[in-house]
């Protein structure tokens, strides 16, 4: 398998190919891979014009990641938040543990983020917060500290389906796809992310939730201030 990369050329090609096929909100990662330097992780933030994303992820805390360590030092998080703001993008705040909510508060206090936020709970990483109903309910309760903010949940591996169902029931948004889970059912590889998205849409419909169009998704995710880069 190829090693993960954050080079602008690969992201530019992917964004153009996606744009030719469908209308979706484009979000790029600043997480990269374990051990990747911050400068490399921020590569996609250099894209401009029609090649630029609309959102970028912001990882706010260090966690154990299996047998590795996913390092997000305080000063690095501040730097990435500043670069996202300078690019005029909306951040998606990635939270892998309960204490990451407090780091998000610090970023708000320092003006590196502005309310309302869009928060993504990533649950089930071995070494971080477990994917359980109790944990998600606690996180959702803490969202009261971020007035007007939206949230979603990504369950890693076998946790993707139950977390998607729980998010729909609790009024949140759902993240699915091959980044977090490669199986459509036990032992059966998914033929791309599309089947996982289709399943998530059915979960929403079964819960009485409307699946957002691209236009509606932009209103939900992008109608918020961009933090001013100091």
List each model region and its residues.
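Glycine-rich, proline-tolerant flexible connector loops at the mouths of alpha/beta enzymes
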Residues: 1-12, 65, 122-127, 182-186
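Alpha-helix-loop-beta-strand connector modules within alpha/beta enzyme cores
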Residues: 2-30, 79-86, 139-146, 194-208
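Short, electropositive alpha-helical surface patch
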Residues: 5-22, 42-55, 105-119, 174-175, ...
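Short, glycine/charge-rich beta-strand/loop segments that flank catalytic centers
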Residues: 28-38, 97-98
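Flexible glycine/acidic-rich beta-alpha junction loops that bind and position SAM and/or redox cofactors
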Residues: 33-39, 68, 123-129, 220-223
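Glycine/small-residue-rich loop that forms an oxyanion/phosphate-binding "nest" at active or ligand-binding sites
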Residues: 33-50, 54, 58, 62-67
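Catalytic alpha/beta core domains of metabolic enzymes, predominantly
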Residues: 54-179, 189-192
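Structured C-terminal cap/extension of enzyme domains
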Residues: 137, 141-144, 165-230
């Amino acid at each position: 398998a190829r090693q993960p990369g954050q080079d602008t050329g690969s992201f530019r090609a992917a964004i153009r190919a996606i744009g030719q096929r469908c209308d979706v909100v484009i979000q790029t990662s600043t997480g990269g891979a374990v051990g990747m330097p911050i400068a490399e992780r921020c590569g996609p933030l250099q894209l401009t014009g029609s090649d630029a994303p609309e959102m970028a992820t912001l990882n706010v805390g260090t966690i154990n990641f299996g047998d590795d360590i996913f390092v997000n030092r305080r000063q690095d998080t501040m730097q990435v938040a500043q670069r996202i703001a300078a690019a005029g993008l909306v951040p998606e705040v990635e939270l892998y543990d309960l204490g990451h909510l407090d780091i998000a508060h610090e970023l708000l206090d320092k003006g590196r983020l502005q309310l309302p936020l869009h928060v993504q709970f990533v649950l089930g990483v071995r070494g971080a917060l477990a994917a359980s109903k109790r944990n998600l309910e606690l996180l959702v309760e803490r969202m009261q500290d971020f007035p007007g903010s939206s949230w979603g949940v990504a369950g890693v591996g076998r946790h993707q389906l139950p977390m998607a169902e729980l998010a729909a029931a609790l009024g949140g948004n759902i993240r699915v796809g091959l980044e977090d889970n490669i199986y459509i059912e036990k032992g059966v590889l998914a033929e791309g992310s599309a089947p996982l998205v289709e399943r998530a849409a059915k979960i929403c419909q079964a819960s009485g939730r409307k699946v957002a169009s691209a236009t509606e998704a932009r209103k939900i995710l992008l109608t918020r201030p961009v933090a001013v880069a100091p």
